[in-house]
Amino acid sequence: MQKIVILRLGHRPERDKRITTHVGLTARALGAEGMLLASNDKGIKNAIEDVAERWGGDFYVENDVNWKSEIEKWKEEGGKVCHLSMYGINLPDAAGEIKLCDKLMIVVGAEKVPTEIYDLADWNVAIGNQPHSEVAAVALTMDRIAQEEPLKREFGYAELTIVPMERGKRVINNVKEE
């Protein structure tokens, strides 16, 4: 089973709150185990961990990490790094090799990322070499490299569970009131 974490660079708390939250939620939904946030925004950490608590799974967020130290430590422990950028090689050309990786850090920038990232990454991968959303880049990448079907994943310890329906909506509350 793949171990995947997201490293979010350049998050600007006043500007990127919603998009960074959605990067984390998308990564969680598609099988990542956590997100490293290379800036200080406890609100992001709390919001995403609250979702994980209510909807299940063990997703974590580490706040205010040193991005370079995290990448170096990850690689020292045998992990690989995939930087999502519109300047990289196209995802279909790299997905097969990335899919074989057991321990993967996916780096997603907000503002302009340090040029050093391009050298530290094992892969610089693009979604069509066009400007795009970080959320879409994470979703497409995680779907294409999944070793298991990410959309059929079940989350343990969920307080709430959605029952898939063709029409309408149904949510089961798994917490029994005493």
Curated annotation (Swiss-Prot):
The keyword Cell membrane does not apply. Keywords: Cytoplasm, Methyltransferase, S-adenosyl-L-methionine, Transferase, tRNA processing. The lineage of its organism: Archaea, Methanobacteriati, Methanobacteriota, Stenosarchaea group, Methanomicrobia. It is found in: Cytoplasm. This is tRNA (cytidine(56)-2'-O)-methyltransferase. Homodimer. Disulfide bonds: none annotated. Pfam families: Trm56. Its EC number is 2.1.1.206. GO terms for biological process: tRNA nucleoside ribose methylation. Specifically catalyzes the AdoMet-dependent 2'-O-ribose methylation of cytidine at position 56 in tRNAs. GO terms for cellular component: cytoplasm. Belongs to the aTrm56 family. GO terms for molecular function: tRNA (cytidine(56)-2'-O)-methyltransferase activity. S-adenosyl-L-methionine binds at residues 84, 109-113, 127-134. It catalyses: cytidine(56) in tRNA + S-adenosyl-L-methionine = 2'-O-methylcytidine(56) in tRNA + S-adenosyl-L-homocysteine + H(+).
